[in-house]
């Protein structure tokens, strides 16, 4: 059942390509809302392997607006995306607010960190998505060597756009009591 006043995003990432030459239509997503407003904020960054700093493709990146320290093991993410072949990610259509961000190699696909074999990454601080209206240069070429026109165009830049997460596997060990020690004190 759809939630009222909620933005939903279908993220095709790199799954659409043309029929003849197999050129990939990258980063395509479709958003719709059950209310009058479509949330439009974005955050982006890169996910690296903590051991060798190699990019990690195909890993789920998620946001939690519940800032409790145990939310990532109890609740599913409120917004998600996946990393591309270069470990890059963008989470789109975010509601304004404060979030914790996580990366999760989600073995059982429940959008929670709940299996000993799942890799995880996180920031130790919160993120607050924002934007600024700015300009950039756009070049029109006559051919591959000759510039026709350089125009200044406006665009929206979203922040943070340089998040770096490092994925690691938690060393899961059972805790055992090695040596019990009881202390008794007498009233003074």
What residue spans do the PLM features occupy?
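N-terminal targeting or signal-anchor segments and their processing/structural boundaries
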Residues: 1-186
């Amino acid at each position: 059942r759809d939630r009222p006043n909620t933005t939903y995003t279908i993220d095709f990432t790199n799954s659409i390509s043309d029929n003849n030459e197999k050129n990939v239509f990258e980063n395509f997503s479709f958003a719709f809302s059950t209310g009058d407003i479509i949330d439009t904020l974005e955050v982006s960054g890169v996910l690296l392997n903590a051991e060798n700093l190699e990019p990690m493709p195909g890993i789920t990146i998620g946001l939690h607006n519940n800032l409790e320290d145990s939310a990532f093991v109890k609740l599913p993410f409120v917004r998600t995306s996946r990393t591309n072949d270069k470990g890059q990610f963008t989470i789109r259509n975010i509601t304004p607010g404060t979030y914790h961000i996580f990366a999760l190699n989600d073995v059982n696909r429940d959008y929670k960190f709940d299996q000993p074999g799942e890799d995880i990454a996180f920031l130790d601080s919160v993120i607050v998505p924002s934007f600024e209206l700015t300009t950039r240069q756009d070049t029109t070429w006559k051919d591959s060597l000759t510039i026709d026109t350089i125009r200044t165009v406006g665009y929206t830049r979203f922040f943070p756009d340089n998040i770096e997460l490092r994925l690691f596997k938690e060393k899961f060990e059972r805790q055992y009591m090695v040596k019990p020690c009881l202390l008794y004190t007498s009233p003074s």
